[in-house]
Swiss-Prot record:
Disulfide bonds, paired cysteine numbers: none
Entry-linked InterPro entries: Rotavirus_NSP4
Recorded domain comment: Binds 1 calcium ion per tetramer.
Protein family: Belongs to the rotavirus NSP4 family.
Positions annotated as glycosylated: N8, N18
Name recorded for this polypeptide: Non-structural glycoprotein 4
Keyword Cell cycle: no
Organism: Rotavirus A (isolate RVA/Cow/United States/B223/1983/G10P8[11])
GO biological process, alphabetically ordered: monoatomic ion transmembrane transport; symbiont-mediated activation of host autophagy; viral process
Transmembrane stretches, start-end: 29-51
Residues that coordinate or bind Ca(2+): E120, Q123
Stretches in topological domain Cytoplasmic: 52-175
SUPFAM superfamilies tied to this protein: Rotavirus nonstructural proteins
Membrane topology summary: Single-pass type III membrane protein
Lineage of producing organism: Viruses, Riboviria, Orthornavirae, Duplornaviricota, Resentoviricetes
Length: 175
């Protein structure tokens, strides 16, 4: 275990890989060498990082299957990202979590739509009652002669009893 996580050992293996690659591919015009070296370095680092991580996870975890599955999925997703793919591998647990989240969001939307529909129905009922109260009915001709100021229209002779009712009267009071 110490040998797996030892930094000097890892660096010496990387140096050994690089020197081996240099000796194999001595042609200076080799254009793909940096890419091959970086991919091999990443693969080696993943190999060195994943084995101790999985061993520790299996020893400390009660649900070892889920941990191993999660580690493997994470490693494959990392490799896919390095290869340039945008897709990722998902487990059934993640799909179920996403489905639950979507269903919960849909339920919340349905409740909101139900509340809004209920409010709309109440508002329509209220508007109907207001309309019924304000309903305009056709009425025959209304006599407006008592409603207008007759002082401006009639002369003194045309008033009933010959007196203008709007003139101030003199009132005497007994003491």
């Amino acid at each position: 275990m110490e040998k797996l996580t030892d930094l000097n050992y890892t660096l010496s293996v990387i140096t050994l890989m690089n020197s081996t690659l240099h000796t194999i591919l001595e042609d200076p015009g080799m254009a793909y060498f940096p890419y091959i070296a970086s991919v091999l370095t990443v693969l080696f680092t993943l190999h060195k990082a994943s084995i101790p991580t999985m061993k520790i996870a299996l020893k400390t975890s009660k649900c070892s299957y889920k941990v191993v599955k999660y580690c493997i999925v994470t490693i494959f997703n990392t490799l896919l990202k390095l290869a340039g793919y945008k897709e990722q591998i998902t487990t059934k647990d993640e799909i179920e979590k996403q489905m639950e989240r979507v269903v919960k969001e849909m339920r919340r939307h349905f409740k909101m739509i139900d509340k809004l529909t209920t409010r709309e129905i109440e508002q329509v009922g209220l508007l109907k009652r207001i309309h019924d109260k304000l309903d305009i009915r056709a009425v025959d001709e209304i006599d407006m002669t008592k409603e207008i100021n007759q002082k401006n229209v009639r002369t003194l002779e045309e008033w009933e009893w010959g007196k203008n009712p709007y003139e101030p009267k003199e009132v005497t009071a007994a003491m």
